[in-house]
Amino acid sequence: MAARPSISVIIPTFNRARYLDLTLASYLGQSDRDFELVIVDDGSTDDTADVVATYRDQVRVACVHQANRGRSHARNTAIEHAQGDLLIFSDDDRIASRSFIAEHRAEHRADTPRVVLGWQEAILSIWMPDLMIAAGTIVELLARRPNLRGQLRDSVTALITPEMVRDELDATIADFSCPEPWQQKIAETIERYGLDLNGYCFPWRLGVTGNLSVPRQLVRDVGMFDVELRGWGLEDLDLHYRLHRAGAATRVSRTAINYHQFHERGPALMHDWNNNALRLIEKYAAVDLELYLRTMRGKLSLDEANRIALEHATLAAAGSSVAADYARLMHDHVHAMFLLVKTKQPG
């Protein structure tokens, strides 16, 4: 019997067979081979099962099929089936760098339990005419690979094949990768507070399950993913928030890199996000979380929110009634703000 793997890579998927094929190919050449892939097919109706089947003899992979129940359910199912003591959360559209597993493992050699946030870049793997991609990014890619110009047409075009990922991963990344918008958005915060995010009150806002690792027992201890958070957004922030409150440190790794494949996005994303934000407000009634959500509505800068959170924590630790009064006022204000948005949403 094969030894139990020490790392489980959690990948939920739903109707993303073409992207998943490239993602799985990137795990064939990992420098660290002591891992398994745990894929939960969340009710796909495309070729997902066939894609996974082609990798069964090439890499250790377990695939669980279930009716479509959403991201949180799918990840919880994967956690229940995982054998590794360390979980790496990734997505079906993330091409892993060759040292991806090894770099995540290295970050967990510290004595204290931690959440490790890997580094994210983007990659153009499949061209679609309606892709939301900056013109400057296209110009940069064409400068590196001029023959792309003839491939960016009015039809869907595969620019990267599984064979290219398997056999020429580094060259493929060099030709087709570009900065990831989310990573660019949070880069200033990481630069200011360092890789350990010392003095930053909202480290959990940076944790997305496209590239995050954490000991499996910690995830189980805090209750895994909240299945009441439905649709898109904030289920990963919610898990990281609970891990943070339970005492887990947060560490950013610049070297545990994966590459987010550009793809089309559905129209209901912000509708889902707002509904999930409202659930978190009602679930926690916590000043730090509500301050962060105010920044997302453009009502406060992150610097201002961080300063207020630090001051509030100091007052609360001293037992000040001002802290309690502020918490009540903040909760009522933010709850009303997001409830108003919900009432204006169609449907």
Regions picked out by a protein language model, each given a short descriptive name:
Residues 66-82, 103:
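Glycine-rich, basic loop-to-helix element that forms the pyrophosphate-binding segment
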Residues 123, 220-221, 230, 245-270, ...:
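Active-site donor/metal-binding and catalytic loop motifs
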Residues 87:
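Short aromatic/hydrophobic "clamp" motif used to bind/position activated sugar donors
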Residues 231-238:
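Acidic donor-binding loop at a coil-to-helix junction in glycosyltransferase catalytic cores
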Residues 99-181:
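Conserved donor NDP-sugar-binding/catalytic core segment of glycosyltransferases
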